[in-house]
């Protein structure tokens, strides 16, 4: 049994698929990549039992259709320093894989008689959703930092895709911050929703980085599949109903600051090392200026910096958790932002001054107690 393939292509695909594998899996077979050669195409599968990624790679040549499983770390380490070339894979009667390259070879034991789990398939009643890969990537990147990690409320440990007759919301929240991306280009006659868990969302962030094609999402009550180009990902959904996120978004926030996002992010990063373990960063707002303060009296450290802004509203002191505030500013790829507040005890809304086309993106952050 023999096939040939370009080294850089195989190495790139294996590195992407390796991110789904959990080497502490209770099923040792899942520590392996599954290679399936069929009709001149190599189909590679990686899985952790709940999430699977399958990719298709064109071969230079092959002599038969066959499949085998190979340990992921061994083959990844063996290929990563090879220069671009055609690799020859040969499996002998003792189930030893020989990888031949320009100046040498590797011998790796493989499993040809295996019962590798088949990725789950969605039911016949699956809902289908098509979205541009770049749009999906941007919205996942904006949402991931707000996903919860809460064993008591697992429903919050993912990104909610909520489709309505007028728009689709992509939402994440951990109870302290909330991201709501509203896409007006998506409408449905039958409102529906699903919750994408954190791990497959993180995998998608990697897979979609260079995706210029459309992504097809299909899901039922338990599983979802996502397909684009040469990739298909299968994942288990989080079951349950996502909380009413719109109910926590303030409707009246008359105190509004407009500020350069990069400048504000730079100030937050500079003062943050001087804050206490609580990460509290105090923000003082006055007409035409914003002052950020951080202090750690236990170590006699303080920091203060002022930057210009446009502010309409009452003079206000409000506190934010600096690490979260910095993450929020970091995911917004815009020049300037609004920060809208009602008072120092209620949630503040952060949004771009110029929204992306056919989108409405808002980020919510709960304030911290400030002792004046």
Regions found by a protein language model. Give the residues of each.
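Structural preference for solvent-exposed beta-strand-turn elements
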Residues: 1-372
